[in-house]
């Protein structure tokens, strides 16, 4: 009998639990649900296993507080970390979550050095960098979930603007996972037709698209403002699953993720959101887009923002 891939989820909060549910429903592999809080991963694992019986899923889900249980994982998704609370500075958040990420990285290095690692913890571009440096894993095996989520938001808003199915929309968002991200209308299409061409046809306007770009940049903040006590978790989880599935099934999908750049786009030793191809070896290649002077300036500004955040942990 073929053995299922082993997928470990570090952090059993809203995103971790949603990830486990989606993995179980899609039967992508057996799951280890880890958390430092006793009872939480065990309780969620039991609940999810019971839900699986209704869906007909035979996926095994184990809840644990022991890092040893992630041993031999094929893939690991990390959501562990504190959310930003009112009155907490970004620097405070970086400091606390860097400490958490160092502990996670040490255990990944010890128990699962061959795993493909997806980081979701914020501030994303810094946390995935810490994971790479502290774990010693090859850079093609450590990526951050960023652009898939940002593009999903851009896709939805574009579908609403053009009154088409979301399946007709393909969009591109580059840069850091924050306010300075760069949604690219020129590389975004409706059934293959670029957005600028659709504007020329009178189906939208530059003003409307700019509003959509601004809304995309603030996509996470909009949800936080509505929820008041938390942040998005369904779409972030669905985005990470897309990345995970491309790796496990060698789908070689081109997805925008936080990838470790080594000269591409003129960036060295930083994690920035760019299109990459994901297959069974991890990151197979970085896709370098030809950017206009204006687009490159926005991208470079976003990169500078990431650099400044990285400086705070050095």
Curated annotation (Swiss-Prot):
Alphabetic keyword roster: NAD, Oxidoreductase, Tricarboxylic acid cycle
UniProt: substrate binding residues: 84, 90, 122, 153
Show the catalytic activity.
(S)-malate + NAD(+) = oxaloacetate + NADH + H(+)
EC code(s) of this entry: 1.1.1.37
Question: Which residues are the active-site ones?
Answer: 177 (proton acceptor)
Where do the coiled-coil regions begin and end?
Answer: none
Q: Which GO terms describe its biological process?
A: lactate metabolic process; tricarboxylic acid cycle
Q: Which domain of life is it from?
A: Bacteria
Top EC group: oxidoreductase
Q: Which Gene3D superfamilies match?
A: Lactate dehydrogenase/glycoside hydrolase, family 4, C-terminal (3.90.110.10), NAD(P)-binding Rossmann-like Domain (3.40.50.720)
Q: Which residues cross the membrane?
A: none
Annotated binding of NAD(+), by residue = 11-16, 35, 97, 120-122
Task: Cite a single GO MF annotation.
Answer: L-malate dehydrogenase (NAD+) activity
Protein's job: Catalyzes the reversible oxidation of malate to oxaloacetate.
What the record says about family reads: Belongs to the LDH/MDH superfamily. MDH type 3 family.
Which named protein is this?
A: Malate dehydrogenase
List the lineage, top down. Bacteria, Pseudomonadati, Pseudomonadota, Alphaproteobacteria, Rickettsiales
Q: Which gene encodes it?
A: mdh
């Amino acid at each position: 009998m073929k053995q299922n891939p082993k997928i470990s989820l570090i952090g059993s909060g809203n995103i971790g639990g949603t990830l486990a549910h989606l993995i179980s429903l899609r039967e992508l592999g057996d799951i280890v649900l880890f958390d430092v809080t006793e009872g939480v991963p065990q309780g969620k694992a039991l609940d999810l296993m019971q839900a699986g019986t209704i869906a007909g899923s035979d996926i095994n889900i184990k809840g644990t507080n022991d890092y040893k249980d992630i041993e031999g994982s094929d893939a690991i998704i990390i959501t562990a970390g504190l959310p930003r609370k009112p009155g907490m500075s970004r620097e405070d958040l970086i400091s606390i979550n860097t400490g958490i990420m160092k502990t996670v990285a040490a255990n990944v290095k010890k128990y699962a050095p061959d795993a493909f690692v997806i980081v979701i913890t914020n501030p994303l571009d810094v946390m995935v960098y810490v994971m790479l440096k502290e774990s010693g894993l090859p850079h093609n095996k450590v990526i951050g979930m960023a652009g898939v989520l940002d593009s999903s938001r851009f896709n939805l808003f574009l579908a609403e603007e053009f009154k088409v199915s979301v399946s007709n929309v393909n969009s591109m968002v580059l840069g850091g996972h924050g306010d300075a991200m760069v949604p690219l209308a020129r590389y975004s299409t409706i059934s293959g037709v670029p957005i600028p061409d659709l504007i020329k046809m009178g189906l939208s306007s530059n003003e409307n698209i700019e509003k959509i770009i601004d809304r995309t940049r603030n996509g996470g903040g909009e949800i936080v403002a509505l929820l008041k006590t938390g942040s998005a978790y369904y779409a972030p989880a669905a985005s990470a699953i897309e990345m995970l599935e491309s790796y496990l099934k060698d789908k070689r999908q081109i997805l925008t993720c936080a990838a470790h750049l080594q000269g591409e786009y003129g960036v060295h030793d930083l994690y920035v959101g760019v299109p990459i191809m994901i297959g069974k070896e991890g990151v197979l290649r970085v896709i370098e887009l030809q950017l206009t002077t204006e687009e490159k300036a926005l991208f470079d500004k976003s990169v500078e923002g990431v650099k400044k955040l990285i400086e705070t942990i050095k």
